[in-house]
């Protein structure tokens, strides 16, 4: 019987294999290997997340019937509001935060990630950010239209953008959302200074933050 615990060889090897795949960068088009990894991840989730397994069985998508990653059932967003969906005990979570509650503010979904998942997400996000946001510069001043993780430890975008700030930002990079709201003074001062010096800055954040400022 296969051991799917967090410390098992199966999980450690799967994390290592996915990380190796990510490190092959965006020009890697090994569809066969991608499918193998996706099926292994599905196997892990199928055997360790009871609500997900029940959902798959009801949809006629038992593990034995899945051959390609396209056949793997996607989890409805409502499931994160009703269940704790993790492949590991939540006390071993490295990150824990809530979804935005867009569909129902009174019932926010909860997401937990172990250290292996955090490492994989950081590697993938770093690769995409370098490719599509900072392809021609190592670091840049970044103004973040979000609260910091210290101010909002349960918000996923705050956690993710802190990684962007530390990996791609200069020391002058800053968060614009404070306990008092949007720091308009810092925002405008930074824009004027950037124009005067001819130095670009990156404005990154949620759409809502920009809407509030433009209004």
Show where each model-derived region lies.
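Short secondary-structure junction/hinge motifs that connect adjacent elements
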Residues: 33-39, 53-78
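Short secondary-structure capping/turn segments at boundaries of alpha-helices and beta-strands
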Residues: 40-42, 84-85
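Active-site phosphate/ATP/adenylate-binding loop shared across adenylate-forming ligases
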Residues: 3-26, 59, 69-215
């Amino acid at each position: 019987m296969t051991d799917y615990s967090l410390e098992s060889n199966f999980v450690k090897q799967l994390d290592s294999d996915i990380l190796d795949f990510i490190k092959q960068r965006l020009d890697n088009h090994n569809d066969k290997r991608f499918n193998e990894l996706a099926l292994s991840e599905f196997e892990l989730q199928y055997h360790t997340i009871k609500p997900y397994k029940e959902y798959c069985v009801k949809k006629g998508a038992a593990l034995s019937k899945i051959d390609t990653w396209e056949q793997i059932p996607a989890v409805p967003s409502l499931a994160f509001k009703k269940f704790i969906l993790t492949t590991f005990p939540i006390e071993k979570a490295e990150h824990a935060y809530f979804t935005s509650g867009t569909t129902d503010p009174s019932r926010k979904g909860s997401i937990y990630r172990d250290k292996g998942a955090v490492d994989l997400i950081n590697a993938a996000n770093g690769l995409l950010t370098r490719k599509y946001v900072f392809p021609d510069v190592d670091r840049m001043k970044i103004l973040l239209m979000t609260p910091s993780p210290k101010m909002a430890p349960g918000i996923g975008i705050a956690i993710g953008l802190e990684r962007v700030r530390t990996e791609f930002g200069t020391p002058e990079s800053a968060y614009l959302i404070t306990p008092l709201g949007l720091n308009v003074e810092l925002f405008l001062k930074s824009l004027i200074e950037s124009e005067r010096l001819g130095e670009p800055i990156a404005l990154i954040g949620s759409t809502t933050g920009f809407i509030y400022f433009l209004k």
